[in-house]
């Protein structure tokens, strides 16, 4: 099985990301309108690090976008990495790509020097709550449009070792 995961670095790779996102925007738990999708693509290109996953035929089968730092701190809190979203083609969701992707994501985040990883998930999804609860703790909850989101946090070292005992630690420390 010839999976390959890259970090986007040029226009061709960014175009593949944008095309994949647009074609699969309805696969999110709360589907994106075209207008919202274009906004998230633009924001990802401007602020994010974009990983693309390819199958053995060179077709894009997944993407993950993360930022170094948080928007609340103008991305100056570089000890934090925020995973903005993960999108995997439905045919690959229960494959070994998840494990391969997890390792590659951990490697990419490790290269940033991050100490903490944060991400959000829909509070109503019992599946996501159980999955993410295995390696991260809920540190807050917020209303996002018409649904509630849990905000998760995990130490990078626990993320790499997939599930150490740390649960929480909502550090909202912005460098001055």
Residue ranges and their predicted role:
Residues 28-80:
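A conserved beta-strand-loop-helix scaffold within acyl/acetyltransferase catalytic domains
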Residues 117-129, 133:
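Conserved beta-strand-loop-alpha-helix junction that forms the acyl-donor binding cleft
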Residues 1-36:
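Short amphipathic alpha-helix that is part of the acyltransferase structural core
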Residues 131-143:
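Conserved acetyl-CoA-binding loop of GNAT-fold acetyltransferases
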Residues 88, 93-107:
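Conserved acetyl-CoA-binding loop-helix of GNAT-fold acetyltransferases
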Residues 111-114:
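Short, high-confidence coil segments that cap the C-terminus of an alpha-helix
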Residues 141-176:
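C-terminal "cap" of GNAT-fold acetyltransferases
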Residues 76-91:
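Conserved acetyl-CoA binding element of GNAT-fold acetyltransferases
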């Amino acid at each position: 099985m010839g999976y390959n995961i890259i970090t986007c670095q040029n226009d061709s790779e960014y175009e593949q990301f944008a095309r994949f996102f647009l074609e699969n925007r309805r696969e999110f738990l709360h589907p994106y309108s075209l207008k919202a999708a274009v906004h998230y693509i633009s924001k990802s290109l401007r602020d994010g690090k974009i990983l693309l996953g390819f199958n053995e035929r060179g077709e894009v089968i997944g993407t993950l976008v993360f930022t170094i730092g948080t928007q609340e701190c103008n991305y100056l809190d570089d000890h934090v990495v925020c995973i903005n979203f993960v999108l995997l083609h439905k045919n690959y969701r229960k494959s070994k790509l998840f494990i391969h992707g997890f390792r590659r994501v951990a490697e990419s985040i490790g290269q940033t020097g991050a100490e903490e990883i944060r991400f959000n998930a829909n509070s109503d999804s019992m599946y996501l709550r159980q999955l993410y609860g295995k390696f991260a703790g809920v540190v807050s909850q917020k209303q996002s449009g018409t649904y509630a989101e849990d905000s998760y946090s995990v130490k990078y070292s626990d993320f790499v070792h997939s599930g150490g005992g740390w649960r929480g630690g909502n550090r909202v420390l912005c460098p001055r």
